Structures are given as structure tokens and as C-alpha cells.
Amino acid sequence: MAVPKKRTSISKKRIRKNIWKRKADWASVKAFSLAKSLSTGNSKSFFVRQINKTKK
């Protein structure tokens, strides 16, 4: 089994963790933006089938 030779420094660990967090934050911002545009009907890149409910 492969074993690392030296311990990873705290600063390197923090840098990698921050990169991972930044990617997650960006994904959440994009998802929220898409949800907002869908709810207002201003979406130009995502198509939703609208069901018209009319009472007769």
C-alpha cells in the first residue's frame, strides 16, 4: 500500500481545502441563479414545459 513519505503542511492543506470550497460556492451561486431565472421566467438557456391549467 502506498504511504506518503512526509506530512502535508497545514498551509498546503488549507490551500487545497479553500480551492474545494471555492468550487462548491461557485456551483451553489450558479444553481441559485438558474433557479431564480426559472422562477421569474427570464431563463434563456433552460427550457421548462409549461402546463396550462384552465377550468371549464
Swiss-Prot record:
Q: Where is the signal peptide?
A: none
Compartments reported by the entry: Plastid, Chloroplast
- Which terms in the Gene Ontology molecular function aspect does this entry carry? structural constituent of ribosome
Alphabetized UniProt keyword annotations: Chloroplast, Plastid, Ribonucleoprotein, Ribosomal protein
Question: InterPro entries under this entry?
Answer: Ribosomal_bL32 (IPR002677), Ribosomal_bL32_plant/cyanobact (IPR044958), Ribosomal_zn-bd (IPR011332)
What GO cellular component entries does it have? chloroplast; large ribosomal subunit
Q: Which GO terms describe its biological process?
A: translation
* UniProt main location, coarse: plastid
Protein family per UniProt: Belongs to the bacterial ribosomal protein bL32 family.
The protein's name:
Large ribosomal subunit protein bL32c
